[in-house]
Structures are given as C-alpha cells and as structure tokens.
Design a protein with these regions (language model features):
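Extended two-metal-dependent nuclease catalytic cores across DNA- and RNA-processing enzymes
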Residues: 1-160
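Short, amphipathic C-terminal "tail helix"
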Residues: 163-165
Length: 165
C-alpha cells in the first residue's frame, strides 16, 4: 500500500530532523506526525492536518480498526469484515476506559493484530528494504517546479509555507 511507502520514507528514508510534508488527505498519516518535523497537508480541505495528538489518534485507530482497509476493531473477529458480519460496536466510553488502563487480556491478541496492521512502524522489514532501495534509485527532482505547481492547483497554504520545506 501507499501507506507503507510513505511511512517507510518518513521513518527511515529521511535525514534526522529533516522537515517533511506529506500531501494527502489520508488520516492514516496523522500517526507519522509523532516524528519531529513531519507535517501533513490535505489537498481536499486545503488545510494542514494538525491539532490532533498523533499518539492518541494511533491508539484509537488501532482500537477502532479501519473498515476501508479491512481491519476490524479489537472487539470483533478477524473475518467479520470479509464475511460481512456486523462488528461489535466500539464506544467512546470504552476507548476512554482503555486509555486509562490496559487492554483486557481477552482483547490483547486482536489489539496486537491491529497494531501490526495499522501502525506504520510495523511495515515488514523486507518491504521497507525494497521501498528504500527503489527510492534511492530515483533522481531527486528540482524544487524549482513547486511554486508553479502550487499556484496552478491553488495550494495557497503550501505556497505561503514553501520556505519551510
């Protein structure tokens, strides 16, 4: 998935403290903002995606799962989405309770399953190697084309902040 590529490049393919801008509306990338100098811009809303604690967002995403990626919440069986079975509802109250205490043992295995599937730090090593190998082969493009691209696509926020990247 593209998530694995972007995640690997942010986590392993950049210099320490290098400012990195992810241009995507995909909220799966919010977790990458745990890393210093990582920012996200949504071309759909034409706004920076910030103001959400990336640690809290990741934990809730792990608990709730991601139906669009076929990942059920931690209360539901592995195959419920594939088999079209309704998931057991994951309430805000329960998420809050589990923030303040540990995940009950009976849900621990599913929590670990979802962590592996949702947390981009768990992208399989062999995929990370392939991603980085391919990335290093590609020539680095010129930043000189960015202002014209941003202007053409009405990306005013990015145009104003281009000096940051």
């Amino acid at each position: 998935e593209a998530d694995d590529i972007v995640g690997t490049l942010v986590l392993k393919g950049r210099k320490p403290n290098e400012r990195t801008l992810i241009i995507s509306s995909d909220k799966d990338f919010i977790q990458l903002q745990m890393n210093e100098n990582v920012f996200q811009y949504s071309p759909v809303t034409k706004k920076m995606l910030n103001g959400v604690d990336p640690h809290e967002y990741l934990r809730e995403h792990i608990l709730r799962g991601d139906k669009s990626d076929g990942i059920p919440n931690v209360l539901s069986s592995d195959n419920c989405i594939v088999d079209g079975i309704r998931q057991t509802p994951m309430t805000k109250k329960l998420i809050k309770e589990w923030e303040e205490s540990s995940i009950p043992e009976k849900h621990r295995e599913r929590f670990e399953r979802n962590t592996t599937l949702v947390d981009l730090r768990y992208t399989p090593f062999h995929l990370q190697e392939k991603i980085l190998e391919q990335y290093k082969k590609e020539p680095i493009g010129s930043r000189n084309i960015l202002p014209a691209y941003f202007t053409k696509h009405n990306l005013e926020t990015l145009t104003k902040n281009i000096g940051d990247f």
